């Protein structure tokens, strides 16, 4: 994958989760909730502060994160793979 996010943005590949109903039935497709966990595939250089310095991001390629999929999250298909482009502010936690 040849993509480089700008500034404080990251490229995330959503991790698939297997959802099971209360009765033990495995839910797939539209019946299953979409995961809000993903793996960081690429990171930007960082956020530009008011004084002009660049604050590096707190995440790195390979980190598994929990994210908020709200306004401003862009879905793209790159090399046949769906990825999300989001700001570091949309990341809620690093797992592990």
Swiss-Prot record:
Q: Which GO terms describe its biological process?
A: chaperone cofactor-dependent protein refolding
Primary location class: cytoplasm
The molecular function GO annotations come to:
ATP binding; metal ion binding; protein folding chaperone; protein-folding chaperone binding; unfolded protein binding
Q: Which UniProt keywords apply?
A: Chaperone, Cytoplasm
Question: Which compartments is it annotated to reside in?
Answer: Cytoplasm
The UniProt entry, under SUPFAM superfamilies, shows: GroES-like (SSF50129)
Q: Which GO terms describe its cellular component?
A: cytoplasm
May I ask which residue range the UniProt record assigns to the signal sequence? none
Q: What does this protein do?
A: Together with the chaperonin GroEL, plays an essential role in assisting protein folding. The GroEL-GroES system forms a nano-cage that allows encapsulation of the non-native substrate proteins and provides a physical environment optimized to promote and accelerate protein folding. GroES binds to the apical surface of the GroEL ring, thereby capping the opening of the GroEL channel.
| Self-association and partners | Heptamer of 7 subunits arranged in a ring. Interacts with the chaperonin GroEL.
Please report which protein family the annotation says this sequence is part of: Belongs to the GroES chaperonin family.
Full protein name:
Co-chaperonin GroES
- To which species is this protein native? Shewanella baltica (strain OS155 / ATCC BAA-1091)
